[in-house]
């Protein structure tokens, strides 16, 4: 087995058959200005203690937040095993990086705050990694976020796409 196949096997195996996690209900602060949440968190964003500048909506449904100065960015993504989310990684991670640098709080969400938004958050954190071992960093981030939130990037296709871009292609 070559190195890339071994890494992919180990990463998918170590994150695949875990006990079923409970869906998260609370918003999670990921970095100083990047937050991960669900649809309900987005609907409550205008009244949140955090003064969000942006909401990144990754659901299929477009919406507005009445009486709010929050800018909504909509990327309609389907949560299934055929959706290619990797084509959005570079743009989303660059956007989240700018929000962090400019101190502009952003809430990234999908319906449950697990797969689509979790994948983009994981991609963002992986893109910031300057460590020499992306495989270990992936496992650290994945399991840390799962411990914090419960369910986190349960879609095997989304995990595979992140592993291919940020772990396999880095080695």
Swiss-Prot record:
It is found in: Virion; Host cytoplasm. Keywords: Host cytoplasm, Host-virus interaction, Hydrolase, Inhibition of host innate immune response by virus, Inhibition of host interferon signaling pathway by virus, Inhibition of host STAT1 by virus, Interferon antiviral system evasion, Late protein, Protein phosphatase, Viral immunoevasion, Virion. Optimum pH is 6.5-7.0. It comes from the Viruses. Transmembrane segments: none annotated. It catalyses: O-phospho-L-tyrosyl-[protein] + H2O = L-tyrosyl-[protein] + phosphate; O-phospho-L-seryl-[protein] + H2O = L-seryl-[protein] + phosphate. Induction: Expressed in the late phase of the viral replicative cycle. GO terms for biological process: negative regulation of MAPK cascade; symbiont-mediated suppression of host innate immune response; symbiont-mediated suppression of host JAK-STAT cascade via inhibition of STAT1 activity; symbiont-mediated suppression of host type I interferon-mediated signaling pathway. Inhibited by NSC-62914, NSC-28086, NSC-105687, NSC-23173, 540211 and 217691 with IC50 values of 48, 51, 212, 342, 4 and 11 uM, respectively. Its main location: virion. SMART domains: DSPc (SM00195), PTPc_motif (SM00404). The keyword Hydrolase applies. Its EC number is 3.1.3.-, 3.1.3.48. Residues 23-171 form the Tyrosine-protein phosphatase domain. One of its GO terms (molecular function) is protein serine/threonine phosphatase activity. The active site is at 110 (phosphocysteine intermediate). One of its GO terms (cellular component) is host cell cytoplasm. Serine/tyrosine phosphatase which down-regulates cellular antiviral response by dephosphorylating activated host STAT1 and blocking interferon (IFN)-stimulated innate immune responses. Dephosphorylates the OPG144 protein. Homodimer. Belongs to the protein-tyrosine phosphatase family. Non-receptor class dual specificity subfamily. This is Dual specificity protein phosphatase OPG106. It comes from Variola virus (isolate Human/India/Ind3/1967). The gene is OPG106.
């Amino acid at each position: 087995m070559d190195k890339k196949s071994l890494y992919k096997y180990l990463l998918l195996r170590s994150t695949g058959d875990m006990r079923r996690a409970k869906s998260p209900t609370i918003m999670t602060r990921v970095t100083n200005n990047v937050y991960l949440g669900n649809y309900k968190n987005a609907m409550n964003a205008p009244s949140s203690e955090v003064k969000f500048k942006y909401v990144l909506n990754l659901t299929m449904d477009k919406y507005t937040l009445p009486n709010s100065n929050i800018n909504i960015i909509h990327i309609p993504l389907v949560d299934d095993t055929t959706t290619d989310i990797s084509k959005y990684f570079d743009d989303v991670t660059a956007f989240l990086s700018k929000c962090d640098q400019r101190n502009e709080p952003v809430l990234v969400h999908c319906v449950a705050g697990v797969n689509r938004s979790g994948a983009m958050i994981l991609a963002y954190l992986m893109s910031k990694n300057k460590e020499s071992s992306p495989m270990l960093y992936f496992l650290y981030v994945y399991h840390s976020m799962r411990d914090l939130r419960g369910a986190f990037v349960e879609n095997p296709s989304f995990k595979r796409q992140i592993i291919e871009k940020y772990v396999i292609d880095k080695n």
